């Protein structure tokens, strides 16, 4: 597998992602209403805004009152419920002025039954022997796109170019990327990249070979495994096995995106608090310090305790506290400013730290020649004590959250509260 076909934008290595659900973000559910949140998100340290699909939604076989964001009528239009094209263009500019990037959710595998192509280009879709459009799987509100049609591929790529040329977006999150052939994505990136070479390509997939095209991919196995761990279904060693698999099976240059929630998980499987309970903050520390890209879903900074409806209006229940705002701000600032947390950087090494006692202690060190980040996570409902038994830990470290300086050497005893986390950094 050749992962050197395309040049990855340098800014991605230290970035983070915030998934935006415009419909549920405010009572208005519009671009203009969301724009009011940009100063708060900038202060929190958010860098990439991933917008769920913003296109008009199909009416035929629609689910619920508003339909699925992923049932698209027109790939070159804006859903009027969210605002106008001018509104979106202004939002992109405001985000750019705030130092943020904007990526769009892109659905290349299926479209609405009343997609504009169905009238003039029915050959763009898979049909049965009687010429009827066919839904993929049991997704009754969408129909399957015919990936073997070169003209369809060209039309889809042209639509992607439209948003770069006219709105200056910064990349794509490919919905269910692996359901669309890799050859299409190669064709798309090869054709689109000259328009804006520093685009970000994110795949909703764990298919390893898709990293030939995509900069980053989802860590679904890790997400499900951590939930099973919290429920007591598996042991900590199983989590280490997933991380080892990621390290050996995926290219060293592959960026992996870690998350505790997204639009699907929140609606269908539960909020992050439901799934992870008291482990949530420790897991978030992991997501922001391990070798990967952290992603935050709309409302996690509250934290959101509501399962949002997928096909109907169901606004996030905001308050003025944003209890996790400063927590995320601290983590995202560390990730941005400490070079030991650069993703897939050959100058950075990750070490599992040897400890004695505390069977559910996860300890790791990330370092380069100048910086270190040291992480201890008590992934247990019990107060746990342990002893550092690793020669790599020897010096004065700064607690990232309290700013207190702490001397840590081999044989240092540490006691941690249930589901607690300790995060240190130091300059070498």
Model-found features: residue ranges?
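Active-site clefts of carbohydrate-active enzymes
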Residues: 251-275
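Active-site beta-loop-alpha junctions enriched in small/polar residues
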Residues: 23-25, 54, 107-109, 177-179, ...
């Amino acid at each position: 597998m050749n992962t050197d076909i395309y040049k990855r934008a340098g800014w991605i290595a230290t970035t983070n992602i915030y998934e935006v659900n415009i419909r549920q973000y405010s009572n208005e559910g519009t671009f203009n209403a969301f724009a009011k949140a940009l100063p708060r998100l900038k202060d929190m340290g958010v860098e990439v805004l991933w917008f769920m699909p913003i296109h008009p939604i199909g009416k035929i076989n629609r689910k619920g009152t508003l339909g699925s964001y992923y049932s698209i009528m027109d790939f070159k239009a804006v859903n009027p419920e969210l605002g106008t094209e001018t509104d979106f263009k202004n939002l992109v500019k405001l985000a750019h002025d705030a130092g943020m990037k904007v990526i769009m959710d892109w659905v290349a595998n299926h479209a609405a039954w009343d997609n504009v192509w169905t009238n003039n280009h029915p050959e763009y879709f898979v049909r049965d022997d009687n010429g009827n459009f066919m839904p993929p799987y049991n997704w009754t509100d969408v129909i399957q796109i015919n990936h073997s049609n070169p003209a369809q591929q060209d039309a889809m790529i042209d639509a992607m170019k439209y948003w770069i040329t006219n709105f200056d977006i910064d990349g794509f999150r490919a919905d269910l990327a692996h359901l669309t052939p890799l050859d299409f994505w190669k064709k798309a990136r090869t054709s689109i990249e000259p328009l804006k070479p520093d685009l970000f390509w994110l795949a909703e997939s764990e298919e390893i070979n898709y990293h030939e095209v995509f900069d980053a991919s989802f860590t679904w196995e890790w997400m499900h495994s951590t939930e099973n761990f919290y429920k007591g279904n598996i042991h900590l060693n199983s989590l280490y096995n997933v991380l080892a698999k990621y390290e050996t099976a995926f290219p060293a240059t592959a960026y992996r995106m870690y998350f505790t929630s997204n639009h699907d998980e929140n609606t269908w499987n539960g909020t992050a608090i439901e799934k992870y309970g008291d482990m949530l903050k420790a897991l978030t520390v992991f997501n922001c310090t391990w070798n990967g890209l952290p992603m935050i879903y709309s409302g996690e900074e509250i934290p959101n305790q509501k399962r949002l409806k997928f096909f109907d209006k169901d606004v996030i229940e905001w308050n003025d506290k944003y209890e996790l705002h400063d927590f995320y701000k601290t983590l995202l600032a560390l990730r941005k400013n400490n070079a030991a947390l650069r993703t897939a950087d050959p100058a950075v090494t990750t070490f599992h730290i040897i400890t004695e006692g505390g069977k559910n202690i996860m300890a790791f060190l990330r370092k380069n020649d100048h910086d270190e980040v040291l992480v201890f996570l008590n992934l247990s409902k019990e107060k746990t004590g342990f002893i550092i038994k690793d020669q790599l830990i020897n010096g004065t470290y700064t607690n990232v959250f309290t700013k207190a300086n702490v001397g840590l050497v081999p044989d240092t005893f540490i006691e941690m509260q249930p589901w607690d986390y300790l995060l240190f950094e130091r300059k070498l």
